[in-house]
Amino acid sequence: MENSLSLDLTKTKPYVEEHEIQYLESIIREMDNTLGKKTGPGNKFLGWMDLPINYNKEEFARIKKAAEKIKNTCDVFIVIGIGGSYLGSRAAIEMISNTFYNNLEKNQRRVPQIYFAGNNISSTYMADLLELVKDKDICVNVISKSGTTTEPAIAFRIFKELLEKKYGKEGAKERIFATTDVAKGALRTLADLEGYETFVIPDDVGGRFSVLTPVGLLPIAVSGIDVDEMMKGAADARQEYSSDNIEKNHVYRYVAVRNALYRKGKTTEMLVNFEPCLHYFGEWWKQLYGESEGKDGKGIFPAAADFSTDLHSMGQYIQEGLRNIFETFINVENPRKSIIIKEDKENLDGLNFLAEKDMDYVNHQALRGTVLAHNDGGVPAIVLNVPELSAYYFGQLVYFFEKACGISGYLQGVNPFDQPGVEAYKKNMFALLGKPGYEDMKATLEERLK
């Protein structure tokens, strides 16, 4: 096993003391046992727990084969999905690939350009994307359990039409890959009818926990990331976080501290990074915790920030605003690349004290200074140390946060594996759009909106 993630809770004191963590050990162990024995709420959606070792090896091989086909066939790869159907793969690709991967020349990329669609309903976004890719060789991966989720369904209808006009029906079917339910749903029916190659979203894995299934694996493999290493990282994390000793299990300690802080009125957790490539990891994390914990009038509100950028916008609030915040810093110990700051003879900017230092050294001092400043201002700080940004550690991070999320949800007395609240806006939208069966509701809503 390679070096693992490590957790530094020094700057959560004096807000949470060690004895408070110890007091929570038995209840956290009980919640973990509930997960493991599959006796708690949402127990039909716990397939993610053993996924790193129990994944479908035959399908995994097909995914890698399909990824090679896409890389050899297409200039552009369009990933159509929303929420858990795209955030995990985008988080991995942005974290591990070149920051400007889509702008590199093809011989530098060695993989297609990758764009995401179906995660909004903006006509401008879609029109701009079509304008960008229409004259290029295109492959599409449409990801939807049902095939009727509005945003990806609209996007796929548009791209299906484009590909069929461009390549004909036979040519299009060779370039469309569907990730969907094993047997039912509109997308499964369409894929079988048209003859698309398909990959299965497991019945026992919910969308926000699905990045290590074909949902995330195909786009990640197309990007050139080593999915074997990613699964190895997740498998090693699964083994490491199986300990029921809170002194040894970082998941237990993270769950204990964030919930102790929540009980003391720290109701907002900010996941903070100092690497721009972690932005979409924060977006993935927000969905994971927001949908899992935010119900029954409870839950820690998940927010994310990109430092040092957001220190120049949100820094004032974090330092001196309402004291309901705690932060979880992702500290990347070793950057992918280095840049040395050179000496300037004139030194008009006064930066020669940084001469011959790596930019990453400056970045780390910014992180350390921020932790101290915010802590002095009444904001507890959890620091999660990550040795490097690689496929292996992406797998570790995913499993760390997924397991912590499941335990934490049970600790808060909610079902962390459902999301009943997301249907409310959809019903209103369908009624306002005039979907059949919503006529009475439409009239009521239109009256309320006057």
UniProtKB/Swiss-Prot annotation:
Gene3D superfamilies in the cross-refs: Glucose-6-phosphate isomerase like protein, domain 1 (3.40.50.10490)
Pfam families: PGI (PF00342)
Compartmental location: Cytoplasm
EC number: 5.3.1.9
GO biological process, any: gluconeogenesis
The protein's annotated pathway: Carbohydrate biosynthesis; gluconeogenesis; Carbohydrate degradation; glycolysis; D-glyceraldehyde 3-phosphate and glycerone phosphate from D-glucose: step 2/4
InterPro entries named in the record: G6P_Isomerase, Phosphoglucose_isomerase_CS, SIS_dom_sf, SIS_PGI_1, SIS_PGI_2
Keyword field contains Transcription: no
Residues at the active site: 291, 312, 426
Known catalytic reactions: alpha-D-glucose 6-phosphate = beta-D-fructose 6-phosphate
Superkingdom: Bacteria
Gene Ontology CC: one annotated term: cytosol
Alphabetical UniProt keywords: Cytoplasm, Gluconeogenesis, Glycolysis, Isomerase
Principal place of residence: cytoplasm
Gene Ontology molecular function: carbohydrate derivative binding; glucose-6-phosphate isomerase activity; monosaccharide binding
Family in the record: Belongs to the GPI family.
Function: Catalyzes the reversible isomerization of glucose-6-phosphate to fructose-6-phosphate.
Protein name: Glucose-6-phosphate isomerase
Species, as recorded: Clostridium botulinum (strain Langeland / NCTC 10281 / Type F)
Encoding gene, per UniProt annotation: pgi
